[in-house]
Curated annotation (Swiss-Prot):
Protein name as catalogued: Photosystem II CP47 reaction center protein
Any GO molecular function: electron transporter, transferring electrons within the cyclic electron transport pathway of photosynthesis activity
Transmembrane domains' residue ranges: 21-36, 101-115, 140-156, 203-218, 237-252, 457-472
Broad class of where this protein is predominantly found: plastid
Family that this chain belongs to: Belongs to the PsbB/PsbC family. PsbB subfamily.
GO biological process: photosynthetic electron transport in photosystem II
Bilayer topology term: Multi-pass membrane protein
Cofactor details (free text): Binds multiple chlorophylls. PSII binds additional chlorophylls, carotenoids and specific lipids.
Matching InterPro entries: PS_antenna-like, PS_II_antenna-like_sf, PSII_PsbB
Subunit (UniProt): PSII is composed of 1 copy each of membrane proteins PsbA, PsbB, PsbC, PsbD, PsbE, PsbF, PsbH, PsbI, PsbJ, PsbK, PsbL, PsbM, PsbT, PsbX, PsbY, PsbZ, Psb30/Ycf12, at least 3 peripheral proteins of the oxygen-evolving complex and a large number of cofactors. It forms dimeric complexes.
């Protein structure tokens, strides 16, 4: 029977051995991709400047995930935090990649073995001798094992009892490191930014999974439920599995885009909402204000601001600024950040301090407008000089830098002031190297943006897959004319296929 390309998976419908084979091969491909991608990223990753050229600026995708689980060292002698390493041990970045590739090879061989030896006694009913799968029991086994893994991760790996812990940082992404995390069992455990919730939720969900698995192993489903939900049909398994996957994809798309303890900004870059809400700008102002109240000068106060914090307060690190179809890392857009020029402070000829209105996330161009402390427009860069009232020249705006490379330097010529006013629209002002990577000056998104876009799209796709396969299994009698009570497990690749005249259609 010839099959069109979109129906080829039906060849494993009544063949448990080869169903296992294709799933093992799929896992081999996933594991092989992960290991290979890690090696590729390690080959192109430059660990020399974790502050101004972190992994997320370089477009690393799998390295952040390896890092958040506790791996920080490389066999190349470097650490993600900038220190030199002499003995990285097995669980280095390269070690993790190698283990995935070795696992992929073993799974590849296992898949071939199961494809060749598909007709095992294990898959035959002891009473009838016919091929059959006890799907509710298999569900119980999977639930029990995944619960065990979930519990083990939360109770041992995350807590540091037997493992490194996970990446934990402060709210501003400045002091991150791998450390053990104690479970948070109170209401604080439900705070998405509290790492303690990761430990407690894995422990709780793991215990629930273990108990649910044991329940499904020891209790048989009622006959009416078994028939009503088509528990004897493997397409029911496909449908419910797709549901689990699309739900997980929606959840992680949300936690990645909006931010959480599981997606630290040091590894994945800031979120767009931190730019929209002036999150870093407010913290910087607060720190400067504290320093001034301690008697420091403006220059000294701004010099105390960590370059890392200032760099977060720059629109080019906002994942919403990169178009979805602009390929490449952030460094390929605005360039490799070299240094912070300092905080630009603007004043008019009357001595009022002026603030440049910052560009919102969804604008490519935005008028350059300078406001005073009360929000009144005092200066701008006009579109048409003939009608201008607030031009830099007319208002006599000057700019002075505090902190950074231009600390103490001031400019009064209008052309230079306009240049820095335009750049101040984008947050703190940095110097970029655009020559090394031939960067084109067009913003790119961070791995946070790619991950969200990919998972939201696949979640939607898989949602329709769940509806499709759920509908097929629940209404098999309507769509294919096959009695839903027909439980014959028959020869590989021959029966229960659409358009196959030899399929039995009714239960005896």
């Amino acid at each position: 029977m010839g099959l069109p390309w979109y129906r080829v998976h039906t060849v494993v419908l009544n063949d448990p051995g080869r169903l296992i084979a294709v799933h093992i091969m799929h896992t081999a491909l996933v594991s092989g991709w992960a290991g290979s991608m890690a090696l590729y990223e390690l080959a192109v990753f430059d660990p020399s400047d974790p502050v101004l050229d972190p992994m997320w600026r370089q477009g690393m995708f799998v390295i952040p995930f390896i890092t958040r689980l506790g791996v920080t060292k490389s066999w190349g002698g470097w650490s993600i935090t900038g220190e030199t390493v002499t003995n990285a041990g097995l669980w280095s970045y390269e070690g993790v990649a190698a283990v995935h590739i070795i696992l992929s090879g073993l799974l590849f061989l296992a898949a071939i073995w199961h494809w060749v030896f598909w007709d095992l006694e294990l898959f035959r009913d002891e009473r009838t001798g016919k091929p059959s799968l006890d799907l509710p029991k298999i569900f119980g086994i999977h639930l029990f094992l995944s619960g065990l893994l979930c519990f083990g991760f939360g109770a041992f790996h995350v807590t540091g009892l037997f493992g490194p812990g996970i990446w934990v940082s402060d709210p501003y992404g400045l002091t991150g490191s791998v450390q053990p995390v104690s479970p948070a069992w109170g209401a604080e455990g439900f705070d998405p930014f509290n790492a303690g919730g990761i430990a407690s939720h894995h422990i709780a969900a793991g215990i629930l999974g273990i108990l649910a698995g044991l329940f499904h192993l020891s209790v048989r489903p009622p006959q009416r439920l078994y028939k009503g939900l088509r528990m004897g049909n493997v397409e029911t398994v496909l449908s419910s599995s797709i549901a689990a996957v699309f739900w997980a994809a929606f959840v992680v798309a949300g936690t990645m885009w909006y931010g959480s303890a599981a997606t630290p900004i040091e590894l994945f870059g800031p979120t767009r909402y931190q730019w929209d809400q002036g999150y870093f700008e407010q913290e910087i102002d607060k720190r400067v204000g504290t320093s001034l109240s301690e008697g420091l000068t403006l220059s000294e106060a701004w010099s105390k601001i960590p370059e890392k914090l200032a760099f977060y307060d720059y629109i080019g690190n906002n994942p919403a600024k990169g178009g979805l179809f602009r390929a490449g890392a952030m460094d390929n857009g605005d360039g490799i950040a070299v240094g912070w020029l300092g905080h630009a402070s603007f004043k008019d000829k009357e001595g009022r301090e002026l603030f440049v209105r910052r560009m919102p996330s969804f604008f490519e161009t935005f008028p350059v407008v300078l406001l005073d402390s009360e929000g009144i427009v005092r200066a701008d860069v006009p579109f048409r000089r003939a009608e201008s009232k607030y031009s830099i020249e007319q208002v006599g705006v000057t700019v002075q830098f505090y902190g950074g490379e231009l600390d103490g330097v001031s400019f009064s010529d209008p052309a230079t002031v306009k240049k820095y006013a335009r750049r101040a629209q984008l947050g703190e002002i940095f110097e970029f190297d655009r020559a090394t990577l031939k960067s084109d000056g067009v913003f790119r998104s961070s791995p946070r943006g790619w991950f969200t876009f990919g998972h939201a799209n696949f979640a939607l796709l898989f949602f329709f897959g769940h509806i499709w396969h759920g509908g097929r299994t629940l209404f098999r009698d309507v769509f294919a004319g096959i009695d839903p009570d027909l439980d014959a497990q028959v020869e590989f690749g021959l029966f229960q296929k659409l358009g196959d005249p030899s399929t039995r259609r009714e239960a005896v």
